[in-house]
Amino acid sequence: MAGQFRSYVWDPLLILSQIVLMQTVYYGSLGLWLALVDGLVRSSPSLDQMFDAEILGFSTPPGRLSMMSFILNALTCALGLLYFIRRGKQCLDFTVTVHFFHLLGCWFYSSRFPSALTWWLVQAVCIALMAVIGEYLCMRTELKEIPLNSAPKSNV
């Protein structure tokens, strides 16, 4: 029995559902962050902000605001890793998977492979933030003490 504690069982359906769930968290929270930022600066929302690699940049205010939204989204998705993945070892795997599918989405949306250096830098920073913070949060919950006696104490 001791070898069975927190053993990893290969469950493809669970893994696929977690991938779909993390993609939903990623695009849902990114959409909310972009809508919030667009509302603050009274800009019209566009799918280009999410999928066009040329939008991200330091030189224009919309580019900087989109970059800020991506960074905030990485922090939000780290919470998604905590609540839905719950394993520190799998945080990097799911983070890279989410960003790989985002790369494919950007490639499909704009009909060209993302070549902007700022896009790649933002994605690298987001991967690092999401994976490290997600792993830290998951490890904190994994290392919590396990109560051995849950019965109430009696004053005998």
Swiss-Prot record:
Report the GO terms under cellular component.
cytosol; Golgi membrane; trans-Golgi network; trans-Golgi network membrane
User: What keywords would UniProt list here?
Assistant: Golgi apparatus, Membrane, Protein transport, Transmembrane, Transmembrane helix, Transport
Q: Tell me how this protein sits in the membrane.
A: Multi-pass membrane protein
- Kindly give the InterPro entries that the UniProt entry links to this protein: Integral_membrane_SYS1, Integral_membrane_SYS1-rel
Q: Which GO terms describe its biological process?
A: Golgi to endosome transport; Golgi to plasma membrane protein transport; protein localization to Golgi apparatus
Q: What is its main location?
A: Golgi
Q: Which domain of life is it from?
A: Eukaryota
**Subcellular location field:** Golgi apparatus membrane
Record field: transmembrane: 13-33, 65-85, 91-111, 113-133
Q: Which Pfam families match?
A: SYS1 (PF09801)
Positions the record marks as coiled coil are none
How this chain assembles, per its entry, is:
Interacts with ARFRP1.
Family label: Belongs to the SYS1 family.
Please describe what this protein does: Involved in protein trafficking. May serve as a receptor for ARFRP1.
This chain belongs to the protein called: Protein SYS1 homolog
